[in-house]
Every structure is written in C-alpha cells, then in structure tokens.
C-alpha cells in the first residue's frame, strides 16, 4: 500500500464579511478536495499543541506523526538539515529572514518576496562582512536563510517577523541570555544591506528593499524516529521551502527536487503533483507541501488566497487523483497545517480540516472540504501527531 499526503499550507481561515460570511476555503472552487471528503473519511485535527506557538514548523512535525512537545527544538534545525548542514553539539541554528524595516516598524517579513538570486548575493555579502569562525550565514530560498552560531545559546526569546507586520519592532527584538549578540548582528546587517546595489535597484524599480536580517526560530540538533522505522514505508518529501524538506530529512524522507518550485503563488504546482506520482514508482509514502495559500494569508490578500487554494485543488489534488485512476494500491490524505486568516495575517491555532480516501474505504458524513464541512466528519483529533496513524492505520495493520 502507498500513501500520499497533500498539504495546503495555511489554507484554513475565518469567515469574512466580504465573502458573505464564508472563509476563503469555502469561497474557493475545490471540486477535487470535495471529492476526497465525500468519498472518504475526515474531520478536524489540532495541529498546534496548547503549549506551542502556531507555525508551519510545529504543525508539519505534528502532521508527520511526531509529538512536538517532546521533539521540537526550533525550526532552524530542520532548515539546516535541508541545506545539508549537520549541526555539531555546540552549534545553534537560527532562521535569518531578510526583512524590510521602515520608520521603526516591521513593514514586510519577506523584503517584498525578494528573489532567491538577489537574496543569495546579499547573504554572501553579510557572511563576508559579519561572519567569523563561530558565526556563519548560509543562503536559502527567497527571504528564508540560516545563521549557525557555534558555541551559541538557544536560551532566548525570539519572534517570527510575520507575527508583527506593521508593528513597532523594538519590543520584539531578541530577549534573554546573550540576546544582545543577536541584536548586534541584526543592527550590523542593516549597515551592510544599506550599501547594496541590489537594494538600490529594487527601490528604483518600486520594490521593497531588504533592510535587515531578523533572527528567530533557534534550535539544536535532534534525532527523530524515521517514518520507515515507524511504518515500514520508504518515502520522499516535495516542498520549495527548506523547513519542510528538513523536517522530511529528519523523518527519513528523501527530498525530491521540482524545477520552478518557488514557495510562492507562482510555484510549479503541476510539477509537484507529477513528481509525487512518479515517486510512487519507487516509494511508499510521499509528503507534498504547497506554501502559496499561507503566503497569501500573510499578505492579507483575499483574491490571492482563493486563487492559491483553487490552484492547489486543481493542479495538485486534481492531478494526483487523475493520475491514480485505476490504481487500487494508493490512499490520499488532504489537509492544511494551520490557519493563516486574512484578518490576522499570521498563523493561528484553531483545528484544521482533513479528509482521506483510498481503496475499500467506507465513507462518513463529510461532504465538502472546509472548516465547517469538517465538523461532519467522523474524527476530531485533539493531537495531530496521531493523524498519520489514523490515516495509515485505515489501510494497513499497524
């Protein structure tokens, strides 16, 4: 038996007056996710434990079957794994966002969704100017990068920049033991970036500049039981972002590269779906993650989020279901990792909908895939790290 997990990052939302009280998920045309819901089982899952901050890190670790209250140390650890950096015992990894600060406020958490090519040059410049034997900077995708501090500490309080969009950022700078070091790095990065030709060109073309690094998400290396060890399934992970690929690596999944996967609304949806179907030739489990709905939620853009959800439905879920026609050896789970409501522009902890279908399944009362539609499902899972057990256990004996 083979298993596909399809994640629309941040698809969940709140009812909006401008959509006649519907959520963006309810307003979107999603016939393929509705098919899964109407021809399988579903319900709601609590992806964010009460003690954890809402985020894609915590939520996706839970969805891969791990209790984050026992295994989570910080998202940057997983991003380091994805980039091929195996942390030493004294290393602490930090997510390093390129952001836009303006008039003392967090104007944009992504520096206007700066391109990977532009960002790579900026991070290389920062590493040249600020890097030392114990402090190194590594480029990632778009605005998402990595800092590794050898001999550093993770005993400090940091905050994601997407949680403070439009707010005065001073009160949210790193706090705690040796946090002054981080604040100094962030301040020094401003001087390096201010002298950048890339930023001057971005400003001239009406784009937001990258004015600073923002450090957060710190953590140390860890060891997780792999999905193959737990379920006897060899698998892969498909995502544009290092966080998800790194969680997959920690779970023993092989990252599958897809050309044109950007981590934004212009991503190569079809390429991801086709790569997932092809991977089933040699793998038993494939985890497919699409970032686009989450980015639209952070932007507070209703039309963009509806479009991202519809693209996920048509080009990911629809392509997968079409490719599986005639097969009786594959089950499909569709869900989102958390909600990124338009009105909040950040992650929240409410339960998310899920639905799955596969050979021989007896359907329940769920008819449509949405936040409210999921209330008719047969499962309401209080801890999402049990969801994978529920899904896989429906088709094979665990």
Q: Which positions does each model-derived feature cover?
A:
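Feature captures the catalytic ectodomains and active-site-proximal regions of enzymes
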Residues: 1-398
